[in-house]
C-alpha cells in the first residue's frame, strides 16, 4: 500500500506519511498505539489524512503544518545535532534525576509531565531558568500542551501537540537555527 500511495499523483506535497492497514497518516501526528498489534498506528488527535482503496490514495485532509520542502531546517552539512534530553516526570519524584540532568548541561531538555504537561514543583525549581531551552510535553499520548502562567516565570516552552520524542527532534532542529526562546516556541506552533 505504501508504494501505491507513493505513486499516486495526489500524494505529491503531502510530506512524510505512514501507510498501514489501509490508512494514510501524517508523520507529525501519527503514533504507535499498541506494542504488538499490526493495526498499531493511529492519529488520535487529528485522525487519518486518508485511505488506500483499490490501490489508490484517497486524501480527505492535509496537514496545515510546515514540513519537508517548506522547512527552514537543513541538516545536510551537519555532522551531529544538538544534544537534547528527555526526562519523564512522575508524582513523588525526588531531586536526584533532575539535578543530574541539569548538571550535564544538555543543549535542550524535554520535560515529560503529567496530564497537561504538569511538572512537579521540585523539578520546576531545579529546571527553571536553566541555561538551555526546556520544553514541557505530556506523557498522555494525545492532546495539546499549551502555555500556563508559570511557563513564563520558568522560561519554559511548550510542545503544542507533539509527543516528547517528536518534540525532542524539533528542538534539536530548532537549535541548529537559533537559541532564541521566542523563535524556538514559534517552531513548535509552525511545525
Which residue ranges define each predicted feature?
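Short, glycine-/small-residue-rich phosphate/pyrophosphate-handling segment
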Residues: 1-22, 26-30, 158-163, 167, ...
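Short coil/turn connectors at secondary-structure junctions
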Residues: 10-15, 20-21, 46, 81-83, ...
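Conserved active-site and cofactor/substrate-binding residues in soluble primary-metabolism enzymes
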Residues: 11, 44, 104, 121, ...
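Short beta-strand segments
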Residues: 17-21, 88, 112, 137-138
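Accessory alpha-helical/coil subdomains and C-terminal extensions
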Residues: 26-116
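C-terminal non-catalytic interaction/assembly regions of soluble proteins
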Residues: 116-191
Amino acid at each position: 500500500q505504501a508504494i501505491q500511495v507513493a505513486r499516486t499523483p495526489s500524494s505529491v506535497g503531502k510530506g512524510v506519511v505512514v501507510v498501514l492497514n489501509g490508512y494514510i497518516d501524517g508523520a507529525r501526528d501519527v503514533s504507535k498505539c499498541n506494542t504488538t498489534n499490526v493495526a498499531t498506528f493511529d492519529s488520535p488527535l487529528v485522525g487519518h489524512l486518508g485511505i488506500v482503496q483499490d490501490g489508490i490514495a484517497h486524501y480527505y485532509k492535509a496537514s496545515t503544518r510546515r514540513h519537508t520542502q517548506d522547512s527552514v531546517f537543513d541538516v545536510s552539512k551537519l555532522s551531529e545535532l544538538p544534544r537534547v534530553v528527555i526526562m519523564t516526570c512522575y508524582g513523588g519524584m525526588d531531586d536526584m534525576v533532575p539535578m543530574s540532568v541539569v548538571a550535564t548541561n544538555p543543549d535542550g531538555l524535554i520535560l515529560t509531565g503529567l496530564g497537561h504537561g504538569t511538572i512537579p514543583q521540585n523539578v520546576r525549581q531545579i529546571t527553571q531558568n536553566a541555561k538551555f531551552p526546556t520544553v514541557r510535553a505530556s506523557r498522555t499520548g494525545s492532546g495539546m500542551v499549551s502555555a500556563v502562567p508559570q511557563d513564563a516565570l520558568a522560561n519554559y516552552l511548550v510542545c503544542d501537540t507533539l509527543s516528547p520524542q517528536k518534540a525532542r527532534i524539533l528542538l534539536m532542529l530548532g537549535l541548529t537555527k537559533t537559541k532564541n526562546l521566542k523563535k524556538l516556541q514559534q517552531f513548535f506552533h509552525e511545525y
